């Protein structure tokens, strides 16, 4: 369809594979891919008995907030606010992870620059790599938290 796109200024997966072609096919496949990724993440987290802390809630909120717009089609740049807020709050607890919200905010800023300045500061094809890097680093932090023996609940008899 004329004027339709799989990516609406959010630097996600569809800028890597092409946001203009196969819109109907990729749209449906993207929704199913997103569902599969979420189910895998939920299964992995759900099979562990974890101590729920503020750190984990903020970290998981940031991870889910990055995961959804990266894999779902037709995401606007404003959908990253959720992740940015959680990552900024996470940095209050873990200041050494300051780079997570900084780089995520950079990609959002680039998405807005097309409207404000009518120009991309960096070609959009490079931006998903920054978003993917932040997503992977945040996912790794979730993985470390889940597998830390200090965060496991002890089973009682």
Model-derived segments and spans:
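Aromatic/glycine/proline-enriched transmembrane-helix motif characteristic
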Residues: 2-70, 146
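Membrane-embedded alpha-helical segments of multi-pass membrane proteins
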Residues: 32-36, 79-87, 127-134
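Hydrophobic alpha-helical transmembrane segments
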Residues: 43-49, 66-73, 88-93, 112-116
